[in-house]
């Protein structure tokens, strides 16, 4: 979770969400 939050802040929420959400839905 902490790693994910760091990635969100680094790359921008919208961009990262589009990449992470599909993984979470697997």
From Swiss-Prot:
**Location(s), subcellular:** Cytoplasm, P-body
Motif placement: Q motif:
1-10
Q: Does the keyword Magnesium feature in the UniProt annotation?
A: no
Q: Name one GO molecular function term.
A: RNA binding
Q: State the source organism's domain of life.
A: Eukaryota
Using the UniProt record, give the first listed, main subcellular location: cytoplasm
Q: Does the keyword Hydrolase apply?
A: yes
What UniProt keywords apply to this chain's record, in alphabetical order? ATP-binding, Cytoplasm, Helicase, Hydrolase, mRNA processing, mRNA transport, Nucleotide-binding, RNA-binding, Translation regulation, Transport
| GO CC terms | P-body
- What Enzyme Commission number(s) apply to this enzyme? 3.6.4.13
Which catalysed reactions does the entry list for this protein? ATP + H2O = ADP + phosphate + H(+)
Q: Which GO terms describe its biological process?
A: mRNA processing; mRNA transport; regulation of translation
Residue ranges of every copy of the Helicase ATP-binding domain listed in the record = 11-26
Residues that hold ATP according to the record: 11-16
Q: What is known of its domains?
A: The Q motif is unique to and characteristic of the DEAD box family of RNA helicases and controls ATP binding and hydrolysis.
Spell out the family assignment given in the record's similarity comment. Answer: Belongs to the DEAD box helicase family. DDX6/DHH1 subfamily.
What is known about what this protein does? ATP-dependent RNA helicase involved in mRNA turnover, and more specifically in mRNA decapping.
What protein does this entry describe? Answer: DEAD-box ATP-dependent RNA helicase 1
Species the sequence originates in: Catharanthus roseus
């Amino acid at each position: 979770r902490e790693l994910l939050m760091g990635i969100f802040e680094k790359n921008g929420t919208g961009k990262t969400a589009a990449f992470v959400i599909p993984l979470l839905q697997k």
